[in-house]
Amino acid sequence: MIKLADLICRTFGPEEGQNHGYPGHQEIELALVRLYRVTKDKKYLEQAKYFLDIRGTGENYFLEERKQANFKRIFPEFEDYDPSYSQSHKPVRQQKTAEGHAVRAVYMYSAMADVAEEYQDKELMQACVNLWENITQKRMYVTGGIGSSGFLERFTTDYDLPNDCNYSETCASIGMALFSLRMANITQDSRYIEVVEQELYNNILAGIAQDGKSFFYVNPLEIKPQQCMPHTSRAHVKSRRQKWFGVACCPPNIARTLASLGQYIYGVDGTSIYTHLYIGNQTDIPVNNNVVQITMDSMFPWEGNIKVKVQGVKENIKLYLRIPGYAENFRLYCDGKEQELVENNGYAILELCKDSKISIQFEMPVEFLHANCKVSADIGKVVIKRGPIVYCLEEIDNGSDLQCIYLNNKEVQKKKSTDFSECLELELQGKRLISPDEGLYSSVAVSYTHLRAHETELHL
């Protein structure tokens, strides 16, 4: 690995005889930072910074490359090349909106956060904040999906979020989770973990079947199976998970993410341990010269009752416990005594000087969310959500033509699923729109028939 990294450092750089270019698909920057953190050899960190600093400056490297006599076009997207596709349209510190290929973008933003942290680069860090806010406030689906265009798998414009032809690649959501996790660990602000959780419990987990044998590459919010036709604008949309793909980045990326969940659950800063996610686990966490053992018992996200046992405490530590934005009546107990909440950036702070047993309780009411009216695709539509889970109305429970279903009240019944372990299903009352005949257009208004709509959970 070091030999390959050294080859990259020799080949690319600002010196005479070196290639003054940068990656077409950003990711090596992340690897170089990680190699620096393992080896402490600063040349790898400097190389990552070089790739970021030169990107989008001067003559565009990819456009100049096309002028070379021996240039060969390999990828069709480079035929009519738009520099924003690879985020090389501006210097990275000047970029304020998420542009181009979604996976490339968030992997680059993750590297920007890493480099900003290592160099204490406030300008680069502010660019990360600007880009993260643009995505989460104007260019991200409620499931955490990013990349609203199937063509070039890219971001488009603010509030352009179609539901039935978007891309929302699984890898893009993994990249967004990586970016958000880095921002959380740098700032200790729980708003970034809200997005990590949104990605993990929705767009990422939806990308893999319960048996782990089939996958979604793209994750639209609305699928009409008969419209998933080849050679159309929905050719990329699949109504069923696929066994494998020609470009098979998503399946192993999901596996890698699930295998590395520990990095998402906890963060450490000095003598402070941050509990980001309430996923049942048992782990050893180094704190200074000590090792703290934490055991968490949890039925989250179906129940808001979490028990945490902390052992091996030999010096004062602070345990930061995230208060989810959707949680109501958050209560904290330590060794049987209810604690007065001391909050900071969305975390409840608990100071421990000895081994302790902690209990966390909160309620997760069903929420009905509405998109900003600038999202034209969502006018007249509602999202049903409980905790981090966005629920999905499916044909197997409610018949076809789901777009005809109308919810006329917010009374929700919760029940245990008979198909998916401890998952909760939601049941609501609603109506179905019925056209007067099979004609395409009519001057007669549609009528309603009563419908009992069963909400089913995503495949988690």
Predicted segments, located by residue:
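Long, well-ordered core segments of solenoidal/helical folds
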Residues: 1-16, 48-63, 77-81, 128-143, ...
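Structural helix-adjacent loops and short alpha-helical linkers that scaffold large soluble proteins
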Residues: 1-2, 36-49, 56, 116-129, ...
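Aromatic-lined, polymer-binding surfaces characteristic
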Residues: 1-37
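Carbohydrate-binding/catalytic loop surfaces
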Residues: 23-36, 65-101, 145-169, 212-242
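Well-ordered alpha-helical scaffold segments within catalytic/enzyme domains
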Residues: 29-40, 107-122, 160-164, 175-188, ...
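C-terminal beta-rich recognition modules with glycine/proline-rich loops and embedded aromatic residues
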Residues: 48, 128, 194-202, 207-309, ...
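Beta-strand-rich binding/interaction modules
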Residues: 316-334
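Single conserved hydrophobic/aromatic residue that forms the stacking wall/gate
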Residues: 450-460
